[in-house]
């Protein structure tokens, strides 16, 4: 069985090499944190799974949140950046790097890409990718130059958190370790699947397509 910790960076503040894990050919087991609360994430992180899916698109609301809707029950809502970063770090640190947090990002929330990756997410997923340009734009947001246009975060890591192998930088680690996944779940996306597949990192949403 694959050992996730062998794919860890030199510090848990940096993302685990989820790309290499996905390309290893080994069977990976995953779970999901559907309750957007640090305590739920802490409990889930004790499980023996390889990765944990955190859905920033349609997180379940707490009972307290539902009460504020004046009797109108709303099943889900997007996560805010602070809670998202906290869930990612909780999974990463509580599991001691044995479970990779990866996140589905809302289509029009490019700022959450930075928050998720800066927090240490091993991968990000964009829903409803319909054409190659959307896929390229998503990769550009997630990768530092020369692979993309992501802005360098000067305050994301401090001290020992910046440790890397000789000749490497934390930006190399982010570029090489974080998986960028495109979720295809529309007719237009299926029509353009061959072009989208040319962009590194692709995953289809079979349940959505059905």
Language model: regions and residue ranges:
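N-terminal amphipathic alpha-helix/helix-capping segment at the start of soluble metabolic enzymes
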Residues: 1-32, 164-176
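Alpha-helix-loop-beta-strand connector modules within alpha/beta enzyme cores
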Residues: 17, 63-106, 110, 114-117, ...
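N-terminal capping/small domains of soluble enzymes
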Residues: 17-54, 60-62, 75-78, 88-91
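Hydrophobic faces of well-ordered beta-strands that scaffold small-molecule active sites
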Residues: 28-33, 52-54, 99-105, 124-126, ...
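Short, acidic/polar
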Residues: 33-47, 107-115, 187-200
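Short, ordered loop/turn segments at secondary-structure junctions
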Residues: 56-59, 106-107, 129-131
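Conserved anion-binding
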Residues: 111, 119, 123-210
């Amino acid at each position: 069985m694959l050992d996730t910790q062998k794919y860890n960076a030199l510090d848990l503040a940096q993302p685990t090499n989820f790309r290499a894990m996905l390309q290893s050919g080994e069977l990976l087991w995953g779970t999901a944190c559907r309750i957007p609360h640090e305590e739920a994430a802490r409990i889930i992180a004790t499980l023996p799974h390889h990765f944990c899916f955190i859905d920033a698109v349609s997180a379940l609301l707490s009972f307290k949140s539902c009460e504020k809707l004046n009797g109108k029950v709303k099943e889900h809502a997007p996560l805010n950046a602070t809670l998202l970063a906290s869930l990612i770090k909780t999974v990463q640190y509580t599991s001691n790097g044995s479970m990779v947090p990866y996140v589905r990002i809302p289509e029009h929330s490019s700022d959450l890409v930075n928050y998720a990756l800066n927090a240490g997410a091993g991968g990000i997923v964009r829903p409803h990718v319909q054409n190659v340009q959307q896929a390229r734009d998503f990769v550009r947001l997630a990768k530092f130059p020369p692979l993309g246009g992501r802005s360098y975060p000067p305050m994301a890591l401090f001290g020992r958190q910046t440790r890397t192998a000789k000749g490497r930088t934390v930006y190399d680690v982010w570029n090489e370790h974080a998986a960028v996944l495109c979720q295809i779940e529309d007719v237009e996306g299926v029509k353009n699947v061959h072009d989208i597949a040319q962009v590194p990192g692709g995953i289809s949403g079979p349940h959505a397509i059905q």
